């Protein structure tokens, strides 16, 4: 019973992240939605790891690895957004075409 609830929560968070990623106009909001998607994947990893083999921690360790990669991705993404804001004075996605300056 608990397994279905956790999978529903993960699917719901993933759907919210995809919807926000598609409809967002701000780069910061897009990064937040991407983090939401990665966290829903982490919930799935831990849930299936506990379901199939609770003695081994493969899903938990992989989830920690994904969290570390997501933290690095967020730091680099925010650095890029702040650099674009300093140069363009806007963080809107449709106004930041870097190819035609």
Curated annotation (Swiss-Prot):
Can you tell which superkingdom this protein's organism belongs to? Eukaryota
Task: Give the reactions, separated by semicolons, that this protein catalyses.
Answer: a plastoquinone + NADH + (n+1) H(+)(in) = a plastoquinol + NAD(+) + n H(+)(out); a plastoquinone + NADPH + (n+1) H(+)(in) = a plastoquinol + NADP(+) + n H(+)(out)
Kindly list the places in or outside the cell where this protein is found, as annotated in its UniProt entry. Plastid, Chloroplast thylakoid membrane
Q: Alphabetically, which GO biological process terms does the record hold?
A: ATP synthesis coupled electron transport; photosynthesis, light reaction
In terms of InterPro entries, this protein maps to: NADH_UbQ_OxRdtase_chain4L/K, NUOK/Mnh_C1-like
Predominant location category: plastid
Catalytic class of the enzyme:
translocase
Keyword annotations for this protein, in alphabetical order, are:
Chloroplast, Membrane, NAD, NADP, Plastid, Plastoquinone, Quinone, Thylakoid, Translocase, Transmembrane, Transmembrane helix, Transport
Q: What does this protein do?
A: NDH shuttles electrons from NAD(P)H:plastoquinone, via FMN and iron-sulfur (Fe-S) centers, to quinones in the photosynthetic chain and possibly in a chloroplast respiratory chain. The immediate electron acceptor for the enzyme in this species is believed to be plastoquinone. Couples the redox reaction to proton translocation, and thus conserves the redox energy in a proton gradient.
Q: Which family does it belong to?
A: Belongs to the complex I subunit 4L family.
Name listed for the protein in its UniProt record: NAD(P)H-quinone oxidoreductase subunit 4L, chloroplastic
Q: Which gene encodes it?
A: ndhE
């Amino acid at each position: 019973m608990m397994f279905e609830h956790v999978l529903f929560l993960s699917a719901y968070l993933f759907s919210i992240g995809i919807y926000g990623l598609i409809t967002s106009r701000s780069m910061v909001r897009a990064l937040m939605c991407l983090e939401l998607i990665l966290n829903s994947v982490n919930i799935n990893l831990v849930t299936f790891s506990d379901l199939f083999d609770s003695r081994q921690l493969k899903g938990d360790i992989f989830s920690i690895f994904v969290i570390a990669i997501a933290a690095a991705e967020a730091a680099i993404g925010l650095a890029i957004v702040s650099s674009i804001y300093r140069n363009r004075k806007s963080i809107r996605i449709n106004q930041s075409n870097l190819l035609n300056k």
